[in-house]
Amino acid sequence: MSQLPFIVGAPGKVIIFGEHAAVYGKPAIAAALSLRCYLLVSPSSDSNTIRLQFPDIKLDHSWNIKDLPWEEIKPYLTYDSANKPQIPSELVPEIVDKLSSFLNGFDNKMHYYACFCFLYLLMNLCDSKVSGMNFIVRSTLPIGAGLGSSASTSVCLSSALALMGGWINKPSLHENDKLDTADIPDLEFIDKWSLIGEKCFHGNPSGIDNAVATFGGAVMFQRTSTPEQPSIRTNMRNFPAIKLLLTNTKVPKSTADLVAGVGRLNAEFNSISTSILTAIEHLSQEAYKVMMNPMFGREETNVLRKLVNINHGLLVALGVSHPALETVKIIGDKHRIGATKLTGAGGGGCAITLVNDDVEESVIHNAIKEFEDSGYESFETSLGGKGVGILFHEDLDDATKFSESQFCNYVDRAAIEDSLGMANVKEWKFW
């Protein structure tokens, strides 16, 4: 077990190619965002209490360790031949029932699901001998914007609890180290348990968000034609960071309604919509080849920008854009800052811009000002980069970064990233 305190950080995600086509068994590609969720784990002054704080959603709840239903849940925990917690494919109904009863009384759904995820993972990865601890989550990701904030949180919790339970080793790689592309047991363990955490939030998630948050880089995924067959997933851990502008239109959307709309188009104009979906498939496959190039550089980035523009046009043809998203694209194109497309389901939500290599910062700021004047929120971030990592207090001279009061009181996302982000703190470790 690592000495407390420590901080875990995991990225969010955006889908860069293949939205909507993925529903029809076509490949899609998601990539990590440099915006992250951060989890501070520190010892509690009360050895009998575990406390979970999530200031960004105004959650602050404590439990007496002895009051948690350890004995009721124990019969339903299983272990593999190495005596490690066995990872179920689904939530265990009996554990769900016990925790649901235990958490009865939460009126705020977001608070309920966060506590449910936390306790489900805690009681599977630790035991009743656990000491009192404080867990504080901060997010530089917009919450509820389809950018994987719940998966990032789940990955942070799974990593911390697995490390404290002694189920994984401490990471040792630094930011600029080349990552192993082979299967890494510790990351596989984190990924699978974080999917269980995601199921606590969402019921039946695809597993893509937590995979990107765990492994970083980018992931190509493809659903199979039958539920019995596992989806195809290819991790691109060493996909390099590319400058990105993320713009949240703040327009609410219904993913289910947008998917249903494409379904109706497909039923009415099958040959046309099939051609569009096939074009998106070919586009995603081309993007994958470009992204896997070991000599990836400016030329390959330019190709991705061209594919971004094509993909947006195809999504417009499917009817899933929105005037706000088109406004983002028009403003971006007017300032010539890069290639812009909607990301995710569309119908509102977010757009991404792959920023041109030679664009001046003042031009980007002018575009951002115009986005803000339209009521949107923009984030200068990057695409790709590292997955889950840990910052250990013994590696850092500045103890204030592990101060609970400072961690809770960062005033905004910029303050969090300035203090903890990998751009400024080089002591982060990765698997």
Curated annotation (Swiss-Prot):
Q: What is its main location?
A: cytoplasm
UniProt-annotated binding residues for ATP = 13, 139, 144-150
Catalytic positions are 209 (proton acceptor)
The metabolic or biological pathway listed in the UniProt record of this protein is: Isoprenoid biosynthesis; isopentenyl diphosphate biosynthesis via mevalonate pathway; isopentenyl diphosphate from (R)-mevalonate: step 1/3
Name of a matching Pfam family: GHMP_kinases_N
Q: Write out the GO biological process terms.
A: ergosterol biosynthetic process; farnesyl diphosphate biosynthetic process, mevalonate pathway; isopentenyl diphosphate biosynthetic process, mevalonate pathway
User: InterPro entries from the entry?
Assistant: GHMP_kinase_C_dom, GHMP_kinase_C_sf, GHMP_kinase_N_dom, GHMP_knse_ATP-bd_CS, Mev_gal_kin, Ribosomal_Su5_D2-typ_SF, Ribsml_uS5_D2-typ_fold_subgr
UniProt xrefs under SUPFAM superfamilies: GHMP Kinase, C-terminal domain (SSF55060), Ribosomal protein S5 domain 2-like (SSF54211)
Q: What induces it?
A: Expression is up-regulated in response to terbinafine.
UniProt keywords (A-Z) are: ATP-binding, Cytoplasm, Kinase, Lipid biosynthesis, Lipid metabolism, Magnesium, Metal-binding, Nucleotide-binding, Steroid biosynthesis, Steroid metabolism, Sterol biosynthesis, Sterol metabolism, Transferase
Q: Which reaction does it catalyse?
A: (R)-mevalonate + ATP = (R)-5-phosphomevalonate + ADP + H(+)
Listed EC numbers: 2.7.1.36
Molecular function terms in GO for this entry?
Answer: ATP binding; metal ion binding; mevalonate kinase activity
Q: Which residues bind Mg(2+)?
A: 150, 198
- Tell me the domain of life: Eukaryota
Q: Where in the cell is it found?
A: Cytoplasm, Cytosol
The GO cellular component terms are: cytosol
- Function, as annotated: Mevalonate kinase; part of the second module of ergosterol biosynthesis pathway that includes the middle steps of the pathway. ERG12 converts mevalonate into 5-phosphomevalonate. The second module is carried out in the vacuole and involves the formation of farnesyl diphosphate, which is also an important intermediate in the biosynthesis of ubiquinone, dolichol, heme and prenylated proteins. Activity by the mevalonate kinase ERG12 first converts mevalonate into 5-phosphomevalonate. 5-phosphomevalonate is then further converted to 5-diphosphomevalonate by the phosphomevalonate kinase ERG8.
- Protein family according to the UniProt entry: Belongs to the GHMP kinase family. Mevalonate kinase subfamily.
Q: How does it assemble?
A: Homodimer.
Please state what the protein is called: Mevalonate kinase
Q: Which organism is it from?
A: Candida albicans (strain SC5314 / ATCC MYA-2876)
